[in-house]
Amino acid sequence: MSSDDKSKSNDPKTEPKNCDPKCEQKCESKCQPSCLKKLLQRCSEKCPREKCPAPPKCPPCPSPSPSSCPPKPCAKPCPPKCPSSCPPPCPPPE
């Protein structure tokens, strides 16, 4: 019997009068931040933030191993960083 009495005090569902039913419905359907704040102030246990659908936690994508993804061979030789038409920024001293 004592455990039942304990659950009553711990379970806020037994005291719906602390929460505004209209606000609770809005919180459940639209999850308005203003409504949530009021609910959290009135009874944080009755309408917890968990009512808002949390974004699914996606597992981290495994980085592809270099062996499974070989680099593509260049069809054409890579051009030099500075084409021959471009003079060197600083001529070598003679």
Swiss-Prot record:
Entries under InterPro entries matching the protein: Lelp1
Protein name per UniProt: Late cornified envelope-like proline-rich protein 1
Biased composition (Pro residues): 53-94
Disulphides: none
Record-stated family: Belongs to the cornifin (SPRR) family.
Pfam families cross-referenced by the UniProt entry: LELP1
Region feature Disordered, mapped onto this chain: 1-26, 47-94
Source organism per UniProt: Macaca fascicularis (Crab-eating macaque)
Highest rank taxon of the organism: Eukaryota
